[in-house]
């Protein structure tokens, strides 16, 4: 899954208005889904299932807030159900978000809804764009805020076999514009064949836009990624390395995806 934008200035104006309506409520980045949206969505009438999993063998050992999931040794994941409504719109449901701590047991973390608007046929465009709106309902150990949301613009360029994609994300905890959190993700990929690609991805969290965190308190993680697109299932796997003290030192991610009809 990933994003493309609807066609024409009328849709663009509607998306901008929707984004502005969301801004008065700020957020924090999620850790169940480690992915750069690339402008591609399910075809109209198609139901797609994507399984997101990430495991942190060497992560932060202190909770982000009292009672929070401690990242070290935890497996986080979620099934994502996506339905292609039309060539420029995909609706999604993430259910259930879950964590499996190193000590064992299963923790349910909540669920998410999303609306992804994109430029149709993004895979065939030299420049593509889109906008994702996400609404999260969180368990107390997953996020201190019971409701959060995400505003994810999508900008991408295809340069021959290379791709450059930027998602300048604003996480929103519904506490006002000044509390919006800037957590961009970036991907530079190279398509070895129509089925195989390699990429470098960076996931960052600078903190709230009213005042970014000090550099050593920010989160910056660099992933080496391999993608396979084809039958019977699409696969994305990667290894991430923390670049700052406030980042998990080592994270493994696996994303499996296929159409169900």
Place the predicted regions along the sequence by residue.
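Hydrophobic alpha-helical transmembrane segments of integral membrane proteins
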Residues: 20-21
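Low-complexity, intrinsically disordered regions enriched in charged/polar residues
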Residues: 16-17, 30
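N-terminal signal peptide c-region/cleavage motif recognized by signal peptidases
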Residues: 24-26
């Amino acid at each position: 899954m990933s994003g493309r934008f609807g066609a024409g200035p009328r849709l663009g104006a509607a998306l901008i208005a929707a984004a502005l309506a969301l801004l008065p409520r700020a957020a924090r980045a999620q850790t169940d889904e480690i992915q750069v949206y690339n402008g591609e969505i399910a075809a109209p009438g198609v139901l797609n299932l994507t399984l997101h999993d990430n495991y942190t063998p060497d992560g932060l050992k202190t909770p982000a807030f009292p009672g929070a999931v401690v990242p070290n040794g935890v497996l986080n994941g979620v099934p994502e159900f996506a339905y292609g409504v039309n060539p420029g719109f995909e609706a999604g449901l993430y259910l259930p978000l879950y964590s499996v701590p190193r000590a064992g047991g299963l923790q349910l973390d909540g669920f998410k809804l999303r609306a992804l608007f994109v430029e149709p046929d993004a895979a065939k465009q030299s420049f593509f764009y889109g906008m994702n709106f996400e609404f999260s309902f969180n368990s107390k150990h997953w996020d201190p805020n019971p409701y959060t949301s995400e505003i994810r613009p999508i900008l991408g360029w295809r340069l021959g076999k290379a791709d450059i994609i930027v998602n300048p994300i604003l996480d929103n905890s519904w506490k006002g514009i000044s509390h919006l959190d800037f957590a961009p993700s970036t991907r530079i990929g190279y398509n070895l064949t129509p089925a195989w690609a390699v990429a470098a991805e960076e996931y960052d969290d600078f903190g709230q836009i009213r005042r970014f965190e000090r550099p050593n308190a920010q989160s910056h993680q660099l992933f080496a990624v391999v993608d396979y697109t084809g039958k019977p299932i699409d696969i994305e796997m990667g290894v991430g390395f923390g670049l700052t003290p406030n980042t998990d030192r080592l994270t493994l991610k696996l994303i499996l995806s296929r159409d169900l009809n």
